[in-house]
């Protein structure tokens, strides 16, 4: 049967692969080639206050958190992802086994005995796992869009099957759920008008409400996450630590670094202390490596964050931040509204001996070039 809507599947998958699986490209050998194109799109979003927030992250990516709930999410992302992959593969094998050995028959056994679209449910679960690991607002919006398109794709497939198999498929519809077993939720009527302008308006309204609700939830999670990451802020300087360091230690490290004459001169040359300039500093254990931050040059390797670090030996990365919006940002709003970080100085301090061990000018960009990476 010819299907004029057959382009939906590759189109939906393209959105999913390019946007939602950014993290998988980032850690692969093709990362530089991928970002040679994708980074331009992310930077384009950052040029307008209307879209710059899409580059932001709404959950911690490399920072430890004092919230047990957030910490748990960081531990289960891989389990969710691989659970979804396993479910997808079971459905895949079942479909193609039926195509090979039971030609012309619909798939109604095993997973399909309770759910009509287990593979779409699997993709939903995979997306949750990826989003927990790489929680960019753009990923969130793309994920909701993908779910919305898959719902209508599933409805379209059901109409085709109903036309092809008739009463037997109608009976199957009556005893199964679309994405979850029917017994979980009971019978639910269609929530959209059948056809015409009313249906089109309802679809647009439903999509807007879903994306709006997801984004609002994302901003709430971002605010909650920042409250549970080690931080303190002044009017023009926000300070974060990926480690769970107390506020007094953060302040001590930053003030000691700023008291060094050479560092103070470097900061002043970039406008520190002048009005309407925003700065963000990271206080990081000396031995930690975080490729998401423009610190030391790191040609290879991922995150290295040993728990048994010396809390007195720290490095402080000072950056000047470009924020989106038409007014100046202060406090933690510098983090929430940050678009670009310009590295200024990387200062190594020993709090125990009250020494500045040295400072250097950090790399201009992260390993992947001028691409928006997580702020916390």
List where the protein language model places each region.
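Membrane-anchoring alpha-helices and their flanking helix-loop junctions
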Residues: 1-108, 126-375
């Amino acid at each position: 049967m010819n299907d004029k809507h057959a382009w939906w599947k590759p189109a939906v998958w393209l959105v999913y692969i390019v946007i939602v699986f950014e993290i998988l490209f980032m850690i692969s050998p093709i990362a530089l080639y991928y970002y040679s194109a994708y980074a331009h799109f992310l930077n384009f979003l950052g040029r307008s206050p209307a879209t710059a927030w899409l580059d932001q992250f709404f959950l911690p990516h490399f920072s430890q958190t004092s919230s047990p709930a957030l910490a748990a999410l960081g531990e289960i992302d891989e389990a969710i992802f691989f659970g979804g992959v396993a479910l997808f593969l079971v459905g895949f094998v079942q479909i193609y086994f039926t195509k090979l050995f039971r030609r012309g028959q619909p798939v109604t056994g095993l997973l399909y005995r309770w759910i009509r679209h287990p593979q779409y449910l699997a993709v939903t679960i995979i997306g949750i796992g990826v989003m927990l690991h790489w929680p960019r607002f753009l990923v969130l919006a793309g994920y909701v869009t993908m779910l919305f398109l898959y719902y209508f794709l599933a409805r379209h497939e059901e109409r085709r099957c109903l036309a092809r198999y008739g009463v037997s498929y109608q009976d199957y519809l009556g005893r199964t759920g679309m994405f979850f077993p029917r017994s979980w939720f009971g019978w639910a009527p269609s929530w959209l008008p059948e056809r015409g302008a009313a249906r089109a308006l309802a679809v647009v309204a439903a999509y807007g409400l879903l994306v709006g609700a997801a984004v609002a939830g994302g901003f709430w999670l971002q605010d909650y996450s920042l409250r549970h990451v080690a931080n303190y802020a002044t009017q023009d300087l926000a300070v974060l630590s990926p480690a769970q360091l107390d506020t007094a230690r953060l302040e001590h490290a930053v003030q000691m670094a700023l008291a060094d004459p050479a560092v103070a001169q470097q900061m002043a040359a970039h406008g520190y202390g002048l009005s309407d300039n925003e700065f963000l500093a990271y206080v990081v254990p000396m031995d930690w490596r975080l490729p998401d931050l423009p610190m030391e040059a790191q040609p290879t390797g991922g995150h290295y964050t040993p728990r048994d670090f010396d809390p007195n030996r720290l490095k402080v990365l000072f950056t000047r931040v470009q924020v989106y919006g038409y007014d100046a940002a202060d406090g933690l709003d510098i983090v929430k509204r940050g678009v670009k970080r310009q590295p200024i100085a990387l200062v190594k301090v020993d709090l125990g001996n009250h020494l500045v061990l040295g400072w250097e000018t950090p790399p201009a960009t992260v390993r992947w070039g001028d691409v928006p990476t997580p702020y916390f």
